[in-house]
């Protein structure tokens, strides 16, 4: 087990690049080390931060508790039958690298989720999704360390209570389960999901008349994301800052009367998902800046660290966007990233 480090700079460990320090910090390289970590004097179950890629957090101040950085790596095939492959990835694996690995193996299911920042361990927590695919569609099970019993358990997909950007791990399981690995059920036969027009067009261009492959879809997704989204290594950000709001069919119909070109996505339960980026863009907020935090000038759904933004800059900007969108559309936006501490959340 790695030694504990004190007063550790967390700026490199959060993709928005907010300045903060951890009172205590330790890197976890193997899942079995959890049994020792929970016995450290610095460990407090109520305050410990289990940190992956730092692409879904906003550090609003120095972190007073222990930060455990999940660095456990490894990918292995578990089973293969009837055109399906179960493949396990450790929580510390970089998500995009894992996606590319599965595509290179000739497996299908994750290609639409290419270039999403973060680690494998975070994928079930947020139920990450893009271009018509969510993590829940391909997750078979999640292996966790149960802090209640201090044992390893495996939760089936149904046990994880997945919903749009939600899961057991954000609700009643938060603070109990530490995700150590995820098992994915992937196909050996490629079945494309091309419900988004821009993706379908990009794949058609790449495949140039031949039957498209999972790699074509992955390459197209990467090209689209690179054209729209800033690289967090160059311009700090946490990807999509707001969830796409879901409203009733009646509310959507009312909005359509005033905004007939409004993008909308009917859901199986009769509700309608709206495009948060479009709502923000209609409020002419692209490029709007408070202190060092700004709305990206090409993608309204992304807030960026333009000039050494403070935590307060980010909070004020997010609050301004929420208020402005609500004033115009009477639709409430909710932030995707976790505010730390949670008392700062809007």
Swiss-Prot record:
> What GO CC terms are in its UniProt record?
cytosol
Top-level enzyme category: oxidoreductase
Copy the pathway line from the protein's UniProt record.
Cell wall biogenesis; peptidoglycan biosynthesis
Q: Which GO terms describe its molecular function?
A: FAD binding; flavin adenine dinucleotide binding; UDP-N-acetylmuramate dehydrogenase activity
Sorted alphabetically, which Gene3D superfamilies does this protein's record hold? Answer: 3.30.465.10, UDP-N-acetylenolpyruvoylglucosamine reductase, C-terminal domain, Uridine Diphospho-n-acetylenolpyruvylglucosamine Reductase, domain 2
- For the keyword Glycosyltransferase, the answer is no
Any one biological process term the GO annotation gives: regulation of cell shape
Q: Where in the cell is it found?
A: Cytoplasm
EC annotation? 1.3.1.98
Print the keywords alphabetically: Cell cycle, Cell division, Cell shape, Cell wall biogenesis/degradation, Cytoplasm, FAD, Flavoprotein, NADP, Oxidoreductase, Peptidoglycan synthesis
Instruction: State the reactions this protein catalyses.
Output: UDP-N-acetyl-alpha-D-muramate + NADP(+) = UDP-N-acetyl-3-O-(1-carboxyvinyl)-alpha-D-glucosamine + NADPH + H(+)
Cofactor(s) needed, names only, are:
FAD
Q: Give the FAD-binding PCMH-type domain ranges.
A: 18-189
The active-site annotation reads 165, 240, 336
- What Pfam families does the database record attribute to this sequence? FAD_binding_4, MurB_C
Matching PANTHER family: UDP-N-ACETYLENOLPYRUVOYLGLUCOSAMINE REDUCTASE
What family does the Swiss-Prot or TrEMBL record give for this protein? Belongs to the MurB family.
What does this gene product do?
A: Cell wall formation.
Please report the name of this protein according to its UniProt entry: UDP-N-acetylenolpyruvoylglucosamine reductase
Origin species = Neisseria meningitidis serogroup B (strain ATCC BAA-335 / MC58)
């Amino acid at each position: 087990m790695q030694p504990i480090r004190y007063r550790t700079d967390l700026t490199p460990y959060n993709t928005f690049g907010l300045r903060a320090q951890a009172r205590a910090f330790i890197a976890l390289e193997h899942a079995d080390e959890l049994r020792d970590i929970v016995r450290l004097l610095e460990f407090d179950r109520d305050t410990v931060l289990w940190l992956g890629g730092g692409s879904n957090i906003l550090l609003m101040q120095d972190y007073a508790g222990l930060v455990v950085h999940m660095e456990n790596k490894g990918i292995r095939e578990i089973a293969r039958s009837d055109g399906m492959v179960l493949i396990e990835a450790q929580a510390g694996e970089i998500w995009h690298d894992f996606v590319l690995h599965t595509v290179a193996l000739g497996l299908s299911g994750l290609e639409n989720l290419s270039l999403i920042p973060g680690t494998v361990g975070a994928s079930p927590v947020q139920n990450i999704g893009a271009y018509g695919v969510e993590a829940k569609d391909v997750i078979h099970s999640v292996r966790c360390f149960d802090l209640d019993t201090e044992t390893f358990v495996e939760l089936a997909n149904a046990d994880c209570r997945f919903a749009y950007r939600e899961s057991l791990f954000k609700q009643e399981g938060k603070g109990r389960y530490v995700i150590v690995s995820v098992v994915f059920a992937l196909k050996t036969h490629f079945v494309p999901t091309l419900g988004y027009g821009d993706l379908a067009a990009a794949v058609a261009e790449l495949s140039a008349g031949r039957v498209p492959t999972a790699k074509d879809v992955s390459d197209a997704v990467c090209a689209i994301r690179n054209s729209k989204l800033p690289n967090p290594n160059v311009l700090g950000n946490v990807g999509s800052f707001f969830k796409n709001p879901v409203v009733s069919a009646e509310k959507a119909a009312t909005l359509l009367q005033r905004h007939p070109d409004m993008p909308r996505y009917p859901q199986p339960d009769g509700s309608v998902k709206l495009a948060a980026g479009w709502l923000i863009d209609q409020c002419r907020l692209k490029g709007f800046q408070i202190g060092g935090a700004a709305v990206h000038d090409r993608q309204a759904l992304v807030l960026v660290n333009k000039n050494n933004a403070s935590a307060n800059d980010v909070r004020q900007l997010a609050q301004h966007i929420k208020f402005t969108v609500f004033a115009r559309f009477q639709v409430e936006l909710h932030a995707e990233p976790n505010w730390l501490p949670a008392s700062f959340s809007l």
